[in-house]
Amino acid sequence: MDSRPIGFLDSGVGGLTVVKEMFRQLPEEEVIFIGDQARAPYGPRPAQQIREFTWQMVNFLLTKNVKMIVIACNTATAVAWQEIKEKLDIPVLGVILPGASAAIKSTNLGKVGIIGTPMTVKSDAYRQKIQALSPNTAVVSLACPKFVPIVESNQMSSSLAKKVVYETLSPLVGKLDTLILGCTHYPLLRPIIQNVMGAEVKLIDSGAETVRDISVLLNYFEINHNWQNKHGGHHFYTTASPKGFKEIAEQWLSQEINVERIVL
């Protein structure tokens, strides 16, 4: 048993979609979350800069004595997960492999779509993982650079969001039966995405799939939280406005949280 918290990092608020699922599946675990909102979105940035920013968040989480780190950001996973995993002596999870595996199990037609940030799509990480596991699966990828700014500005239910999602995803409609939400921000737009793609298309939330892997690793390494130890509580950090982060986070997590601003 291990009562240390699990560390989560993201370029902004998107990683909260993973945290929400962890609260549901693993309510006994404690969370330290950092969102680098001041420098979001990561998708258009050069790979080396994304790697540098991700390491800054990792090093911050290590000062909090976390027992595991979850890179709850597809862009950071695509660019930095392998390197970080190899250099740390605690488990490090990314969100790409769990999403790819779930998509393969989901598709009946062998036609999978991936939507993500420009860097995630450019990295080709999802397609490589899917075709390594299922060579006959057809994969189409689409960058959606306007989605993250909509979420970060808390406009998920706006007419702008509906317009942008419709215009962006129209080329994919009718061409696949499974769509990976390849950015942890995108589940916050899920109702609109589902409406555009059609009810028959299965949406894969890579973050939710990742929580299943978290549970497996907690059991494997025997580092589940000890209920007998007093909780230290959850802690949330942002590099931007705590007020803006708190507003979106409480709306999404359906609970009050405390947020601190930090400088990396």
From Swiss-Prot:
Any one biological process term the GO annotation gives: regulation of cell shape
Involved pathway(s): Cell wall biogenesis; peptidoglycan biosynthesis
Pfam families, per the entry: Asp_Glu_race
Molecular function in Gene Ontology: glutamate racemase activity
Reaction(s) catalysed by this chain's protein: L-glutamate = D-glutamate
Signal peptide: none
EC number, as in UniProt: 5.1.1.3
This protein's UniProt keywords: Cell shape, Cell wall biogenesis/degradation, Isomerase, Peptidoglycan synthesis
InterPro entries noted in UniProt: Asp/Glu/hydantoin_racemase (IPR015942), Asp/Glu_race (IPR001920), Asp/Glu_racemase_AS_1 (IPR018187), Asp/Glu_racemase_AS_2 (IPR033134), Glu_race (IPR004391)
Disulfide bonds: none
Active site: 73 (proton donor/acceptor), 183 (proton donor/acceptor)
Positions contributing to substrate binding: 10-11, 42-43, 74-75, 184-185
Protein purpose: Provides the (R)-glutamate required for cell wall biosynthesis.
Recorded family membership: Belongs to the aspartate/glutamate racemases family.
Protein name: Glutamate racemase
Organism: Streptococcus agalactiae serotype V (strain ATCC BAA-611 / 2603 V/R)
